[in-house]
Amino acid sequence: MSEQDLNKNNEKAEAEKETTVNETAEVAKAKEAEKAAENKTEMKVEKKEEAKAETGKEPFKKIKVIVVTSGKGGVGKTTSSAAIATGLAQKGHKTAVLDFDVGLRNLDLIMGCERRVVYDFINVIQDEAKLNQALIKDRHVDNLYVLPASQTKDKDALTEEGVEKVLRELDDMNFEYVVCDSPAGIETGALMALYFADEAIVTTNPEVSSVRDSDRIIGILNAKSRRSELGMEPVTAKLLLTRYVPSRVKKAEMLSVEDVQDLLTIPLLGVIPESADVLKASNAGNPIILDTESDAGKAYADAVERLLGNEVPLRFVTEKKGFLSKLLGKGK
């Protein structure tokens, strides 16, 4: 064998040795990563068990609690609660929508069931009625039930233990989603709803004051939550921008989608355009999502798709062309 061949063989052996060392290192690295992941999982389980031992609480078996909240009133929060709950039920998910606004009951009006209210949320909490007596089956969509708020009871009647009891019963009844229509701001009902949230939909208008108040809500989301007490992942917050008017954004009379996202720094769930159809639907007791011809109804349907993890293009964020603009090729 020539010296040249010998050198080649030596180089080949060295290369194979280096490859083996690298492969061994990669295997060791993968095992370390796997062990770290297992340790992390074990720590989470231990943390949950410790939390359960300390608080006497445990996670719900099935339900996901979605709280629709806002920093101020008049942003379309109850309209959004009704639309999102209806949309989830339309997708085949057993859904309950709960009105946490004790003393200012409105959800039943938008859902069109105000004349069918016999018992309410507080009646159930105070053992004056059973949950299945108070739940109202929606007349539009299967799989959807409404639990109205009380118009007459003291807001302090909404207790943590009472809400826990109701949610636990809904969990036992195989509900998948519970949508909570929270009062605006940080009063008792709002804080109670936020405490039980798995996800929070922060509803805001594209106005500075509305966005500022929403920022306060985001700030308190994880300050005291059931999830943190149970050692679970933090509450997920998503942005729902309502009453959006692209022409006003263009004139700098309104914040743009990007402006609001920059200020609140939470993922965007949807943009709902300003529409007279919303008021018409609410007055008729029909959630706007049922109006499949309206832009607002379509936008809420898109938001529900995103809530379920589906990718949907963002619509209704640019100004629509008028007839003459289209004819003349303007308004691009």
Q: What is each residue range found by the language model?
A:
Residues 57-63:
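Phosphate-binding P-loop
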Residues 172-173, 183-267:
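Conserved catalytic-core segment of NTP-binding enzymes
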Residues 65-128:
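Walker A/P-loop NTP-binding active-site region of P-loop NTPases
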Residues 100-172, 282-283:
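P-loop/Walker-type NTP enzyme "switch/lid" segment
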Residues 2-18, 23-35, 40, 44-57, ...:
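C-terminal lobe/tail of nucleotide-utilizing enzymes
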Residues 63-67, 176-179:
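Residue-level preference for the first positions of well-ordered beta-strands
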Residues 118, 132, 160, 164, ...:
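Amphipathic alpha-helical transducer elements in NTP-driven molecular machines
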Residues 96, 145, 179, 238-240:
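A structural signal for isolated positions on well-ordered beta-strands in alpha/beta enzyme cores
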